[in-house]
UniProtKB/Swiss-Prot annotation:
Reaction it catalyzes: tRNA(Ala) + L-alanine + ATP = L-alanyl-tRNA(Ala) + AMP + diphosphate
Protein name from the UniProt record: Alanine--tRNA ligase
Residues the record lists as binding Zn(2+): H569, H573, C671, H675
Name of the gene this protein is made from: alaS
Cofactors required: Zn(2+)
CDD domains referenced in this protein's UniProt entry, alphabetically: AlaRS_core (cd00673)
Length: 891
């Protein structure tokens, strides 16, 4: 029975909605507060804290159609995309979840009914195979005795290599924590395709395809590998939307389902590619443009690390496949509208950011175009010179990566098409040397999270919205990542957890509170406050006495610091609203930092903000401050917040009930931070900096209150000091500076003219030193203490005079450092294959203490401790003589 992808998605949601599941929208592709994941890669990610016991579920039964990415980290399908029928970087995962409600029986019955009932998907029962874990007799019996599946089509799967719980049918979140057996459901495409049934380790082929995984979380794995029963049994299932759609549409490839087929046809029309059937490059581009659009929509921008680097890799892989199809113009941005049209169920949220997405893609492709051609030339040359082992060195791959922006995957992709391997071990070793300080999760966080997991029943209640102090009880003490009953070590960093606290835990960009905890026998100085799930942790040092579990303490927040933080937090809301009004609706928050000194606000926008726009923003916000607008807080249902147009952050995951902060009639935003009660408390607002931090992302830094007044006073003082130096008053200062500038520019032109005449005289004198090796004009000479720009200009002039030849200039700098520049005319490079970069390498090997690099026609290096420049000149002349004399094409 043919069903469109939109119908399949909706029927899945409708089926489980009828089974009393709450339909929860897809979360962002960027996981919220989860450093273990690069991207959301499954439906359960947004419920991870529920499975860990850190957050109580709003609903017992949930169903989602989650947008996912698998193009980085542990789950990385990027290299397979376009070359297999099922791999995608961006896809949707259909899933139903139970949090302490139904378990194996209902989960299996639900899956069977949806797949086989003629009112739903209507698949043939004889086409369905199932695997269960070898020790999960309960699931096996449900499948056989209740569902009625033939024992010929159900397989028990054991552990791999006898490793405990290492099985395709045993799911675990990590080495410790929630885990359990799973039932995997497969579809048999029939005997026309090759492949062995599920359970075989080899020769799987493509006949049997996994379509759904039902995970039953029933155990908590301990450090000693012992499994203990979880107090709350849960179900987590996942089924790829594109994969089940392919089955329902009678095709064996994700790229042949309706959404891809239509998208590929339209892409081929725009790119003017005639052959679009089984065109692997079009498959790559169709997949990648979907990934690009949704990543940028969720706030990711191209960069050199993390999520931004994955996006950059995807864009550059797309561009390279465009070049394979003969498209040399910038094209990716033209495809954005096609994604919006064909992903019409989310077209509204995409269309609002269409211009931003197109601009970011245009800028990134333009940037890559500048180096793509040169990088391909280097790669082509390197591939031609390979030995019989057909392995490209990791050094060349790293040079392509650092100099020409070729992600390693792109280099491997190109090499793979020619059956050439890349020495990834060498590449990784070079990368490791370059990045010894790469970021890793600290052992503290790992240990601390384990502690939280073992005591997740404890929670902290935050009361700091209404008060700055309260009586509290100590419910946990930590020192050296260990839970303790008594704290007596003074000045040692420690952590205190209270049942009730006025201290705000760092979140939403707002820093944590500081202050004091005072007990009967001790005083604890709180330096910072952090939030882990529902637990608020006070980090600091005991400054006197002792603290005990169960002891009553008086918790006192630093009131003045908190008030300044609240002023800045409310100001970010005013800034966000002002940017939307002045720059446009495409503006979305990308991040923030809010402390008591200043705040910064990152947002999506593709151009620098003009001084006029900055003035407009400042004027609007200051007027709102002086209008004495009320700041109100309301707790309401998420749906109600949407209906009143509250701003919601893309990366944030919200509960059923949300806190809404409204400032007059100019700002409504979901927020958990602390705020002023009236805008007049802000006093004054001034933007101090505005700059770009990535492709399509700008940052504003701003100050308020006394800090803003200090900025004005400091600028006034600076103007007065400049006026004093210029011997002018404030009124005429600008005219005086213009006069100074005009005089400077006149003197600068005269100096440059004089230098130019001297350079020409020097060039003419050097030309007289030209000699021949065979028929090649050669100039090797030296100069002293010349600026690099002047040196390069002189080399260019010498090449012009020679018309054909090799120029080598040695610039002797201070401390006896020789800066050698080699430039070769185009005819010698193309006809006789004399390369400047090769000559540099010869010199480096000869002198043994040089370092440099370059291109075919231009290269340079530095040599330390040159004591005799004349000997160096002779040495290079001799080297050139040997090289040129051995080139047979030169007579």
């Amino acid at each position: 029975m043919y069903k469109s992808i939109d119908v399949v998605r909706q029927e899945f949601l409708d089926f489980f909605h009828k089974q009393e599941h709450q339909v929860v929208p897809s979360s962002s592709l960027v996981p919220k507060n989860d450093q273990t994941l690069l991207f959301t890669n499954s439906g359960m990610n947004q419920f991870k804290d529920i499975f860990l016991g850190l957050v109580k579920p709003s609903y017992k039964r949930v169903v989602t159609a989650q947008r996912c990415m698998r193009a980085g980290g542990k789950h990385n399908d990027l290299n397979n995309v376009g070359y297999t029928e099922c791999h995608l970087t961006f896809f949707e995962m259909l899933g139903n979840f139970s949090f302490g409600d139904y378990f194996k029986d209902d989960a299996i019955q639900f899956a069977w009914e949806l797949l086989t009932d003629s009112n739903w998907f209507g698949l043939s029962k004889d086409k369905i195979w199932v695997t269960t874990h070898i020790e999960d007799d309960e699931s096996y019996n449900i499948w056989v005795k209740q569902v009625g599946i033939s024992t010929k089509r159900i397989v028990k799967i054991g552990n791999k290599n006898s490793d405990l719980y290492d099985s395709d049918n045993f799911w675990q979140m990590g080495n410790i924590g929630p885990c359990g057996p799973c039932s995997e459901i497969f579809y048999d495409f029939g005997s026309d395709l090759k492949g062995k049934p599920p359970g075989y380790m080899q020769g799987l082929g493509s006949r049997y395809i996994e379509i759904w995984n039902l995970v039953f979380m029933q155990f908590n794995r301990q450090l000693n590998d012992r499994l203990i029963d979880l107090p709350m049994l849960s179900v987590d299932t996942g089924m790829g939307l594109e994969r089940i759609t392919a089955i329902l549409q009678g095709v064996h490839s994700n790229y042949l389902i309706d959404v891809f087929k239509n998208l590929i046809v339209d892409i081929s029309n725009i790119m003017k590619v005639k052959e679009y059937i089984n065109n692997r490059s079009l498959y790559v581009i169709a997949d990648h443009i979907r990934a690009c659009v949704f990543l940028i929509k969720d706030g990711v921008v191209p960069s050199n690390e993390g999520q931004g680097y994955v996006l950059r890799r995807i864009i550059r892989r797309s561009v390279r496949h465009g070049r394979k199809l003969g498209v040399n113009d910038i094209f990716l941005y033209k495809l954005v509208n096609l994604v919006i049209v064909h992903m019409n169920y989310v077209s509204n949220i995409l269309y609002d950011q269409k211009d931003l997405i197109e601009q970011i893609l245009f800028n990134e492709e333009k940037l890559f175009n500048n180096t793509l051609k040169k990088g391909l030339e280097l790669l082509e040359k390197s591939l031609k010179n390979l030995n019989q082992d057909k392995i490209l060195s990791g050094e060349i791959a790293f040079q392509l990566y650092t100099t020409y922006g070729f992600p390693l995957e792109l280099t491997k992709d190109i090499c793979c098409e020619r059956n050439i391997k890349v020495d990834q071990l060498e590449f990784d070793q070079i990368m490791l040397t370059e990045r010894r300080n790469s970021k890793r999760l600290s052992q503290f966080h790992k240990n601390f999270n384990n502690i939280i997991l073992s005591s997740y029943a404890k929670t902290s209640t935050f009361v700091g919205y209404k008060c700055f102090s309260c009586q509290s009880k100590i419910i946990a003490l930590l020192q050296d990542n260990e839970l303790i009953n008594k704290m007596c070590d003074v000045d040692q960093e420690s952590m205190v957890i209270l049942d009730i606290t006025p201290f705000y835990g760092e979140s939403g960009g707002q820093i944590g509170d500081s202050g004091y905890l005072k007990g009967e026998c001790g005083v604890f100085k709180v330096k910072n406050t952090k939030k882990y799930g529902q637990i608020i942790v006070h980090i600091g040092v005991l400054i006197s006495g002792i603290f005990l579990i169960g002891e009553q303490v008086f918790a006192q927040v630093n009131r003045l610091k908190r008030k300044d933080i609240s002023v800045n937090h409310s100001s970010t809301h005013l800034l966000h609203s002002a940017l939307l009004k002045i720059l446009g609706s495409h503006v979305t928050q990308q991040g923030s930092l809010i402390n008591d000194k200043y705040f910064r606000f990152d947002f999506s926008h593709y151009n620098a903000i003009t001084i006029t726009q900055i003035n407009e923003v400042e004027n609007l916000i200051n007027q709102q401050i002086w209008d004495n607008l009320l700041v109100t807080e309301n707790i309401m249902l998420m749906e109600s917040a949407r209906n009143i147009g509250a701003i919601m952050l893309l990366h944030k995951q919200y509960t059923e009930k949300v806190r809404v902060i409204q400032i007059g009639d100019c700002s409504i935003e979901l927020c958990g931070g602390t705020h002023v009660s009236n805008t007049n408390e802000i006093g004054l607002f001034i933007i101090t900096k505005e700059f770009g931090i990535g492709s399509g992302v700008r940052r504003i830094e701003a100050v308020t209150k006394n800090a803003a007044l200090s900025v004005i006073q400091n600028k006034k003082k600076l103007i007065q000091n400049i006026a004093q130096i210029a011997q002018s008053d404030d009124v005429n200062l600008l005219n005086v500076i213009h006069e100074f500038k005009a005089r400077y520019e006149k003197l600068d032109r005269e100096i440059k003219l004089l230098n130019s005449k001297q350079e020409i005289q020097k060039v003419l004198s050097l030309v007289r030193e030209v000699y021949y090796i065979k028929n090649v004009r050669v100039l090797v000479n030296h100069v002293k203490n010349m600026e690099s720009s002047s040196l390069f200009k002189m080399v260019k002039l010498l090449k012009h005079y020679l018309q054909s030849g090799i120029v080598v200039l040695i610039n002797i700098r201070k401390n006896n450092i020789a800066h050698i520049v080699i430039s070769i005319t185009k005819d010698l490079v193309e006809c006789n294959r004399i390369y400047a970069i090769d000559l540099i390498q010869y010199i480096i090997r000869s002198v043994k203490n040089g370092k440099g690099g370059g291109r075919f026609d231009f290269a340079q290096l530095n040599i330390n401790n040159v004591k005799n420049v004349s000997e160096l000149v002779i040495q290079i002349q001799s080297l050139l003589n040997d090289i040129i004399c051995n080139i047979k094409s030169i007579k």
